[in-house]
C-alpha cells in the first residue's frame, strides 16, 4: 500500500535511486496504490551524470510492495521492499534493465515491456 510521502526504491537503471510518491494516478481521492498502479513521484536520490536528476518529477509504475498481494488462487505474495519503475507518458520504461522480481499482474495491465525486461516474474 503506497500513499503520498512514501519512499520507494527504483528497480531499473534509469538513473534514479529513490522516489517519493506525491500523487496516485487514476482517481481524485484514491488513498493507496498497489502493484501495477501508476504514480507521480519526485526523485529523492539519483546517480550522478545520468539523464534523471534529483528533484525531477516523473511517472512510475509500482512493481513491488511490502503489503501482501492476494491472488484468486489463494496465493499470497509479499516482497521485502517497495519498488517502482520509472516510465514515460506511453508507459514504456525509461531504463533498459529491470532489477529484482516483479509480479505477473503487470502483464495483464499491459506493461509487457517491463515484464520482458525483468529477470524473474512471480
UniProtKB/Swiss-Prot annotation:
InterPro entries: Ribosomal_uL14, Ribosomal_uL14_bac-type, Ribosomal_uL14_CS, Ribosomal_uL14_sf
Main location group: plastid
Superkingdom field: Eukaryota
Pfam families registered for this protein in UniProt: Ribosomal_L14
Leader sequence residues: none
Location relative to the cell: Plastid, Chloroplast
One Gene Ontology MF term: large ribosomal subunit rRNA binding
One GO location term (cellular component): cytosolic large ribosomal subunit
GO biological process, one term: translation
Keywords: Chloroplast, Plastid, Ribonucleoprotein, Ribosomal protein, RNA-binding, rRNA-binding
Subunit structure: Part of the 50S ribosomal subunit.
Recorded family membership: Belongs to the universal ribosomal protein uL14 family.
Function: Binds to 23S rRNA.
Protein name: Large ribosomal subunit protein uL14c
Species in which this protein is naturally found: Atropa belladonna
